[in-house]
Swiss-Prot record:
Superkingdom in the source lineage: Eukaryota
Alphabetic keyword roster: Lyase, tRNA processing
Xref: PANTHER family: TRNA-SPLICING ENDONUCLEASE SUBUNIT SEN34, TRNA-SPLICING ENDONUCLEASE SUBUNIT SEN34-RELATED
Disulfide pairings: none
Gene: tsp-4
Region (Disordered): 117-138, 169-188
Subunit structure: tRNA splicing endonuclease is a heterotetramer composed of tsp-2/sen2, tsp-1/sen15, tsp-4/sen34 and tsp-5/sen54. Interacts directly with tsp-1/sen15.
One BP term from GO: tRNA-type intron splice site recognition and cleavage
Listed Gene3D superfamilies: 3.40.1350.10
GO cellular component, one term: tRNA-intron endonuclease complex
Chain intervals with Polar residues compositional bias: 170-184
Name of the protein in question: Probable tRNA-splicing endonuclease subunit tsp-4
EC number(s) given by UniProt: 4.6.1.16
Amino acid sequence: MSSTEDDRQVRISKIAGRYLVFDIDDVAYIRRQHGICAVFTGTMPQNPTQNVFLGLPLELYAEDAKMLLDRKVAYIADDPLEHLTQLKSMDDETRKSYLQSIKTQRRTAQLVFNEAKAQSMAKHKDKRKPKQPQPSVVVPTELPLSASSADGVAAAVDQEEEGGAEFLLESSSSKPLKTDASTPPQKPLVKEKLPAITPTTSNAMISNGTSNPDVENHTALPLYSYLNERGYFITPGLRFGGDFSVYPGDPFRYHAHYMANSYGWDEKIPMLDLVTSGRLGTAVKKSFLMGGQKPATEDSEAGELRAFCIEWAGM
């Protein structure tokens, strides 16, 4: 892990009770370093009428946000309040700094575009320029000329030379050459043209605050942290009938191995729920995982977490 990632603080925006991440670099960081996938909830600019492929922002579970806070790699910001406060108190210096950051992003986009264009032109240069066939060299053969034909050729050559000389004289007299080269032609000043961009975040406008609103504690947090610390990736499990879908690695590479539910340590679990969950997990080719943590007491903190897997073996 690089030093920049060691000091990285992920900004989690709390909006209407939801925990959202708007920066694509933060999304890549928490997925790569902390095994958090979460769910994209934004529309794609190229095709906003579909909901199969979604984009930023990334919506986190409350368990995700709490876990990142405990690891001290993120902070939660009350986004509406911070934006209103900053916009009302923005001075000229802050405004200039924000505009300069936008211009820097535009220059970066232009450099990336120019580099991609140069690579594309170099790649397709040979395809656009077909090879020219080599002209064949014909060696003329010497033929004997008669006296009359030789005189005719000489006369034609003399006439062509005289006509060429007259043409040169006429062109030189009608269009005199300019010899004054002391003042070179001045090029008109061209204003720098940069591509227009739409900023995806407003981080450059607001300061990096450290306000951390309270994150509600869910009963599923112990099981969630237990699985994450062991390298499992977790996504919503509604489509498989559980609270979570648990993957042994990145979901881009693996299928889910478990559908997981969290229970309280003293919570009574109906036997019918165990049977139906076990059968459902086996039907979707997964194991049903259930777990709970021993609660804290006056003498000790929260104890160990126990997890069990259930499979339906058949009749």
